[in-house]
Structure formats: structure tokens, C-alpha cells
Amino acid sequence: IPFLLSLGSKFLGGVLLDKMRPEQAPVLFVVGGAMTALSVVALMLSHQPAWLALFMLSANVFWGLQGAAIPAVIQHHAAREAVGSAYGIINGIGNICAAFIPLLMGMVMRSVGSVSSGFSVLVVSQVVTLLAGGMLLLRMRRAAAISA
């Protein structure tokens, strides 16, 4: 089920992007980041198995929703002859960061002494995504307004 939900949310993100103007693409980072962070906070605070499952799955959906925005933003900003290289660099940096998230979560869990505390790392990552997406959204809207 988690894989299918992730696949579906990535597809939904792509469909939404197809209906948006290019300068609106960061909206998915803002909304997806906020909803993922809220889902993870709810997960951390919940103790009922059904709610835990629901919040984990909802975090997965909102995380996946953001995926399609990455190549869309890169295509909008990168020079036409460098889109593939730009995406490769961004994807590589993202993979390196993602590789350290479980380690960082484990360090937080060990220092605080609870499993749920480790999920705060995911909350912070999504707050950063929300803020960066918001700044990118403002920047892209300003650029679109100037060129219009």
C-alpha cells in the first residue's frame, strides 16, 4: 500500500503541475512540505496503531506529491542544454542528504531516548523544504511578473 500511494501521489503531483504555470511549481513544495511535516508531527504524538498507520501513509503521500516539482523547476531554471546535468546534480545532492537522514534520526533517538523523537528530523527537513519552496515561489513569481 505505501508504494502504491507514493506512486499515485507522484502521478497526482505531475497532473497538478501540468495544470499550473511554471512559476507556480514551488507551490507543491510549500503545500507538500507543510502537510508532510504536520503528518509526521501527528505521527509523533499518536499512540493508536490505526492513527499511526494513517499518519505514516499520509506523510508518504504528501512527500511523494512534491517529487514531480523537482524536474519541473529545474527545466524552468536550467539552460536548455544543461537540464539533464542540472537534474543529475540536484538528484545526487538529494540522495546524499537522504542517505544521512536515518543516521541523524538514530542519533536523535539515542540522545533523547524515544523513537518518535527521531522523526523530528523529518519535520525539520520538511520545514526547510517549505521555506525554500516559499522563497523559490516568490522569486519565480517576481521573475514572471517582470517578464510579462
PLM regions: where:
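C-terminal ends and interior cores of transmembrane alpha-helices
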Residues: 34-47
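Helix-to-loop junctions at the C-terminal end of transmembrane segments
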Residues: 10-22, 109-110
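A membrane-interface helix-boundary motif in multi-pass transporters
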Residues: 107-126
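Multi-pass alpha-helical transporter architecture, strongest
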Residues: 43-44, 120-148
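Hydrophobic core of transmembrane alpha-helices in multi-pass small-molecule transporters
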Residues: 50-65
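A late C-terminal transmembrane helix in Major Facilitator Superfamily
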Residues: 77-112
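Intracellular juxtamembrane helix-capping segments at the cytosolic ends
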Residues: 65-78
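Cytoplasmic membrane-interface "Motif A"-like loop-to-helix N-cap segments
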Residues: 18-33
